[in-house]
């Protein structure tokens, strides 16, 4: 083992000498001096802080606490190219390999990202079409108008189904694969849609929504996970946001189709039927596309893992690909347990007993809960009902404006999330949402809405200028939501180390769907019992408290490596330390990008051992 490690070190240093003439390893020993040429190809750092010396003795380790965490820049009297070496952040011998692919994103990665993001589109289309369908169903189910309670049950059925499957989706993805799980979610969408299209009874419609919810729960968890595992770290945040873009795009298209089919007989059935198109497309594409390299390594299929990496990074040498696969294999073996069940329970234990993991869980679940209990999904599910209530005849047209705003500001978040930072856009978005919700609550008070019994017929004083105020500030609310809390929670995979990531993201996603279930099944009841003013005041209060939570508990993670995230959370939330570190990392990344003229900002990829 010693000879193998030494040989690996010599090979790594020789490769670095070729690519980076002024390379110095992380312990400050051994600089290679050749010509000053640089490349835009692949970058491989082999960190050897604890490498055995000539006498066979290991040097003393220097664990780095959060307060003393440093980023050590290479020192060279002649030239400083801006690259950095991360010191070890744990008490283990650090023999990890750092691999960065400094090149343009390949068409293969773009293809995988967009195909996986179709799940986000289906998720968004589901939340969008039901709003229009609830308005146009009329007496098509059981030959009677749906009550508020029945509307809530139809809507909440999807959230219940998503909650059930999201709990075990992470483990299923480890056992069966990410791609098969997404294809299974397509089958659930297919069955659920067919049941709804042919429904003439309330129970069949609810059953179809429940089964479709199974697919939504799987897709909402696996799609971001799939993208994060195939994306280069230098643009991982932005590629993950593409899933959110597809989600908001699905909502926008659903509202547009709903507006067009609003007065067509059985138009809501056509609206549901259109959801079959992306379902069939994703299933068909995945018949010809591979799974992620990490999954293939987990199953011991190293040949396929190498194949996917080669197609993803077309200009990368075979030696670097081989080294990457070896590190992924070593990481997989570091997860305790010999079978999936044992590994699952060990991961659950580590998630709750390791302080940094538990803080990550608090943040991940907290953000997903905030996303639901600030009321956005209730607006998406029942926007048609809300806008009819305030006097708008073509409520679907107004819903298009709201969902269009959501899409545009999600697109803005796509460009800002890695540059401005996750924490900053959250602390802009949540206060903005709070103000908008407070104004909506006040406007509802002066509008004077009166509910007429327990059915879906609402008596109001008619349209007034307060209705305009409500619409305007719901649009403002949508903009601030999309910019921050609508996007950041789905970056949850970066919070957790690899050995608990599947379980951690399952917990967080399940929290999202549990919140969605509660809101979807109680929103119309809240409107009746505590009035729209009370309902929107509740959402405003949650948004206000959420701002405080994010201010004190959400560190800045933009630009940080996975090891750095765990160090930040090791003995607290360490907001100041995270902001300082993120700022320094961004400066050094910018300097490195300017020096090497890269198309994308390079970010080192640290594979945890």
Swiss-Prot record:
Lineage: superkingdom: Eukaryota
Keyword presence, Cell membrane: yes
Which CDD domains does the record associate with it?
A: MFS_HMIT_like
Where is composition skewed (Polar residues) in this entry? 25-41, 63-72
Instruction: Quote the Gene3D superfamilies the UniProt record gives.
Output: MFS general substrate transporter like domains
Residues exposed to the Extracellular side:
126-152, 201-209, 262-269, 381-396, 445-465, 528-533
Reaction equations catalysed: myo-inositol(out) + H(+)(out) = myo-inositol(in) + H(+)(in)
- Biased composition, class Basic and acidic residues, residue ranges: 42-58
The subcellular location is:
Cell membrane
Question: Which parts of the sequence are annotated with region: Disordered?
Answer: 25-83
Q: Which residues lie on this side of the membrane: Cytoplasmic?
A: 1-104, 174-179, 231-240, 291-359, 418-423, 487-506, 555-609
One of the record's GO cellular component terms:
plasma membrane
Q: Name one GO molecular function term.
A: myo-inositol transmembrane transporter activity
Keywords from the UniProt entry: Cell membrane, Glycoprotein, Membrane, Transmembrane, Transmembrane helix, Transport
Q: Which PROSITE patterns match?
A: MFS (PS50850), SUGAR_TRANSPORT_1 (PS00216), SUGAR_TRANSPORT_2 (PS00217)
Q: Which residues cross the membrane?
A: 105-125, 153-173, 180-200, 210-230, 241-261, 270-290, 360-380, 397-417, 424-444, 466-486, 507-527, 534-554
Q: What does this protein do?
A: Minor transporter for myo-inositol.
Protein name as it appears in the record: Myo-inositol transporter 2
Record organism: Saccharomyces cerevisiae (strain ATCC 204508 / S288c) (Baker's yeast)
Please spell out the taxonomic lineage of the organism that makes this protein. Eukaryota, Fungi, Dikarya, Ascomycota, Saccharomycotina
């Amino acid at each position: 083992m010693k000879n193998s490690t030494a040989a690996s070190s010599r090979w790594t240093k020789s490769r670095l000498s070729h690519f980076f003439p002024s390379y110095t390893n992380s312990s400050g020993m051994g600089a290679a001096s050749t010509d000053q040429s640089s490349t835009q190809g692949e970058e491989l750092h082999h960190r050897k802080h604890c490498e055995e010396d000539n006498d066979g003795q290991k040097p003393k380790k220097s664990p780095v606490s959060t307060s003393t965490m440093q980023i050590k820049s290479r020192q060279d009297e002649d030239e400083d190219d801006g690259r950095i070496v991360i010191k070890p952040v744990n008490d283990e011998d650090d023999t990890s390999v750092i691999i960065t692919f400094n090149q343009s994103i390949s068409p293969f990665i773009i293809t995988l990202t967009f195909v996986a993001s179709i799940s986000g589109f289906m998720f968004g289309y589901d939340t969008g079409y039901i709003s229009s369908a609830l308005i146009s169903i009329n007496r098509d189910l059981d030959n009677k108008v749906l009550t508020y309670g029945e509307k809530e049950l139809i809507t909440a059925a999807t959230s219940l189904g998503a909650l059930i499957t999201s709990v075990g989706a992470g483990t299923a993805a480890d056992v069966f694969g990410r791609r098969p799980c997404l294809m299974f979610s397509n089958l659930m969408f297919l069955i659920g849609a067919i049941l709804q299209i042919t429904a003439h009874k309330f129970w069949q419609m609810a059953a179809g929504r429940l089964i479709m919810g199974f697919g939504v729960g799987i897709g909402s968890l696996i799609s971001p996970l799939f993208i994060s595992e195939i994306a280069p770290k230098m643009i991982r945040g932005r590629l993950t946001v593409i899933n959110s873009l597809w989600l908001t795009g699905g909502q926008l298209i659903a509202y547009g189709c709903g507006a067009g089919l609003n007065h067509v007989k059985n138009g809501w059935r056509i609206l549901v039927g259109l959801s079959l198109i992306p379902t069939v497309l994703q299933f068909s594409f995945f018949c010809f596309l591979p799974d992620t390299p990490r999954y293939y390594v987990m199953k011991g299929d190293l040949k396929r893992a190498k194949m996917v990496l080669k197609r993803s990074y077309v200009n990368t040498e075979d030696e670097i690909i081989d080294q990457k696969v070896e590190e992924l294999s070593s990481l997989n073996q570091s997860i305790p347990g010999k079978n999936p069940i044992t590994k699952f329970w060990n991961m659950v234990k580590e998630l709750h007993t390791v302080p940094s993991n538990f803080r990550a869980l608090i943040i991940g679940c907290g953000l997903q809960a905030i996303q639901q209990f600030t009321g956005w999904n209730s607006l998406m599910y029942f926007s048609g009902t809300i806008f009819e209530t305030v006097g708008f005849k073509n409520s679907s047209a107004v819903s298009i404006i709201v969902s269009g705003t959501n899409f545009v500001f999600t697109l803005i978040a796509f460009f800002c999330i890695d540059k401005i930072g996750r924490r900053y856009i959250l602390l802009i978005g949540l206060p903005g949402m709070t103000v908008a919700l407070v104004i909506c609550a006040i406007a509802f008070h002066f509008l004077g809405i009166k509910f007429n019994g327990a059915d879906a017929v609402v008596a109001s004083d008619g349209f007034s200028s307060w209705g305009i105020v409500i619409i305007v500030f719901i649009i403002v609310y949508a903009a601030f939501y999309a910019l921050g809390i609508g996007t950041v929670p789905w970056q949850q995979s970066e919070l957790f180390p690899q050995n608990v990531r599947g379980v951690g993201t399952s917990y967080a996603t399940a929290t999202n769907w549990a919140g969605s279930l509660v809101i979807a099944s109680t929103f119309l009841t809240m409107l009746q019992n505590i009035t729209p003013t009370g309902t929107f005041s509740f959402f405003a209060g949650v948004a206000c408290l959420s701002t405080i939570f994010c201010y004190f508990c959400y560190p800045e993670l933009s630009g940080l490596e996975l090891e750095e995230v765990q160090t930040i959370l090791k003995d607290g939330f360490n907001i100041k330390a995270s902001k300082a570190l993120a700022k320094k990392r961004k400066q050094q990344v910018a300097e490195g990008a300017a020096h090497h003229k890269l198309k994308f900002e390079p970010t080192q990829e640290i594979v945890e051992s």
